[in-house]
A protein has these predicted regions:
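Long compositionally biased, domain-poor regions of proteins
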Residues: 147-151, 158-163, 177-181, 185-187
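Positively charged, small/polar-rich N-terminal and surface patches that mediate targeting and assembly
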Residues: 1-35, 42-50, 57-59, 66-70, ...
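A compositionally biased, intrinsically disordered/low-complexity signal enriched
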Residues: 61-64, 178
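Short beta-strand-to-loop capping motifs
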Residues: 40, 75-79, 143, 177-181
């Protein structure tokens, strides 16, 4: 089994929690809870990680997804200690340290100011979160592995008054769309850069 991503979200922000609720097939997370997001290969191995966490702690699963190549697990609880213990149980099952995850690799990062009304309309058609108004600033991020998009979104919402438009945390890469005033987007972008840079892991030279 390969640990691809493992991130601890200390306090789920309202929009990010709400976004996860739209896709969660398990117990829905609430804002204010702590969460753990884990990406594993092969995907079917996610079942063993869920087993390890649930038998040792009082966390509950929001997502356990097996997709084409990878598995994604989201666990949460109000007790941050329980979530930390779930992380420890998963690492023990894998027989690895947290730093043996892949380090985040940013594949694309863009800030687009003064978005045209036609483009905002197209984005609003595909988004599952908040709306983007014409004239606002758009931030986009593509990160590898995909699981790191969750902590990027949560940190952005924690640090700036932005709208989470779309969040993709599984697949080949993670993707994030944010909208808001230019100054707030700049603050969110800086927060994302800082949190991703602080996640130590194995060298990551590709997007596979």
């Amino acid at each position: 089994m390969e640990l691809r991503a493992l991130t601890y979200l200390d306090v789920l922000q309202p929009q990010v929690a709400g976004f996860i609720q739209t896709v969660a097939q398990g117990m829905m997370p609430l804002d204010g809870q702590a969460a753990l997001v884990v990406e594993i290969a092969p995907g079917i191995a996610v079942n063993a990680l869920t087993d390890a966490a649930l038998k040792r702690t009082r966390v509950v699963p929001g997502m356990q997804i097996v997709e084409r190549a990878y598995g994604l697990l989201e666990l949460h609880a109000f007790d941050q200690g329980e979530v930390r213990q779930a992380s420890a149980a998963i690492l023990e099952r894998l027989g690895v340290a947290e730093t043996e995850r892949l380090a985040p690799r940013v594949l694309s990062r863009e800030i687009i100011t003064g978005v045209d009304a036609h483009q905002s309309a197209m984005i609003n058609r595909m988004r599952h979160g908040q709306m983007l108004a014409a004239g606002q600033t758009l931030y986009t991020l593509e990160v590898h592995p995909a699981g790191y998009a969750a902590i990027a979104a949560n940190e952005a919402e924690k640090r700036a008054a932005i709208s989470v438009l779309e969040l993709v945390t599984l697949g080949a890469v993670g993707r994030l769309w944010l909208g808001g005033d230019e100054e707030e987007i700049q603050q969110a972008a800086a927060a994302i850069d800082a949190v991703l840079a602080g996640l130590a892991g194995r060298p990551n030279g590709g997007n596979k």
